[in-house]
UniProtKB/Swiss-Prot annotation:
The modification Phosphoserine is found at residues 8, 10, 37. It is found in: Nucleus; Chromosome. Proteolytic processing into mature chains is required for histone eviction during spermatogenesis. Transition proteins (TNP1 and TNP2) are required for processing. Its main location: nucleus. Residues 24-35 have a biased composition (Low complexity). The keyword Phosphoprotein applies. One of its GO terms (cellular component) is male germ cell nucleus. Keywords: Chromosome, Developmental protein, Differentiation, DNA condensation, DNA-binding, Nucleosome core, Nucleus, Phosphoprotein, Spermatogenesis. This is Protamine-2. GO terms for biological process: chromosome condensation; nucleus organization; spermatid development; spermatogenesis. Testis. Interacts with TDRP. GO terms for molecular function: cadmium ion binding; DNA binding; zinc ion binding.
């Protein structure tokens, strides 16, 4: 199991954090050139490791199972049908009808 660690602002010196904020604002405003400056690149390299994993969190097996289970439960709810379709006898095998839910 992999644990992701995000650095909090309190862990690093306040000056370094202030530099990071200023560097990000410059990049957004388009004042800085396309390439990273030596100082900015260094700060980016340090923070990028911590925050990239925080942004992209992979779907765990347990979470996928939970999502799938929730969907299959909602499939079982009976949908209301209009009067003319209610009394129509079923045709074919019932197991075929169930298979529709397993696609998800």
């Amino acid at each position: 199991m992999v644990r992701y660690r995000v650095r909090s602002p309190s862990e690093r010196p306040h000056e370094e954090y202030r530099q990071l904020v200023n560097w990000q604002e410059q990049g957004r405003n388009g004042q800085e050139e396309q390439g990273l400056s030596a100082e900015g690149g260094e700060v980016y390299g340090r923070t990028h490791q911590g925050y990239s994993s925080y942004r992209r969190r992979r779907c765990s097996r347990r979470r996928r199972y939970r999502i799938h289970r929730r969907r299959s439960r909602s499939c079982r709810r009976r949908r209301r049908r209009s009067c003319r379709y209610r009394r129509r006898p079923r045709r074919g095998c019932r197991s075929r009808r169930r298979r529709r839910c397993r696609r998800y």
